[in-house]
């Protein structure tokens, strides 16, 4: 939005106020300057639903990190358009929801996915190699609540085969980007990024 200032602050309350107390104390400033605000407790685990298709490396990494307590989240379900990882997910005691997605039933499939999200009380959806482009309607309904991990240093090399694109362009760095999902493919606000350097060593396209 134009003519808006956005700010995110992390702080610790030495007096131990509750979130409700902080909201009440902050409200006069909100009214005075016509601000929009939200308070979140960093210690509270976010309820998350993962979405995956047929590549399991992201899913397995998230499940492992969640299992050892390395992620401050509560995985309340996994949604997939395939059955490949049902046993893996249910072995962790997590509900697995198989919803087949085709061009013909995409609207109905997304409506079913949204019902699962609402019923589970999930605050976030994480796309762990979910190989379907979400509709504009779903992106709008879940604005700011869907996270994608794209395997390039955005805004470079959007879309499919980003490593191949990077290799053909001859770049010396490749990266990964976590971003919020919007209706524009790989264009959402960036959350975090990381990079690694690459060499001139021969690389097989099968690994890109």
Question: What do these predicted regions represent?
Answer:
Residues 83, 161-189:
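Short, glycine-/small-residue-rich phosphate/pyrophosphate-handling segment
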Residues 81-87, 134-135:
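Short, glycine/polar-rich helix-capping loops at beta-to-alpha or helix-loop-helix junctions
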Residues 1-44:
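A conserved regulatory-domain signal marking ACT and ACT-like small-molecule sensing domains
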């Amino acid at each position: 939005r134009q003519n808006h200032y956005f700010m995110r602050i992390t702080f610790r309350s030495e007096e131990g106020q509750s979130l409700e107390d902080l909201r009440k104390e902050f409200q006069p400033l909100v009214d005075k300057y016509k601000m929009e605000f939200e308070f979140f407790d960093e210690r509270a685990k976010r309820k998350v639903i993962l979405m995956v298709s047929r590549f399991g490396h992201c899913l397995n990494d998230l499940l492992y990190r969640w299992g050892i307590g390395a992620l401050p989240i509560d995985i309340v379900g996994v949604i997939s358009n395939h059955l490949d990882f049902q046993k893996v997910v249910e072995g962790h005691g997590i509900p697995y929801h198989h919803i087949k997605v085709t061009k013909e039933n995409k609207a109905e499939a997304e409506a079913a996915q949204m019902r699962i999200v609402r019923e589970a009380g999930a605050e976030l959806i994480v796309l762990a190699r979910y190989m379907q482009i979400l509709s504009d309607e779903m992106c709008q309904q879940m604005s700011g609540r869907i996270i994608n991990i794209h395997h390039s240093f955005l805004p470079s090399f959007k879309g499919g085969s980003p490593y191949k694109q990077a290799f053909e362009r001859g770049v010396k760095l490749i990266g990964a980007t976590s971003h919020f999902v919007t209706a524009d493919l790989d264009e959402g606000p960036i959350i975090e990024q990381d990079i690694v350097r690459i060499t001139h060593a021969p690389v097989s396209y099968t690994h890109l």
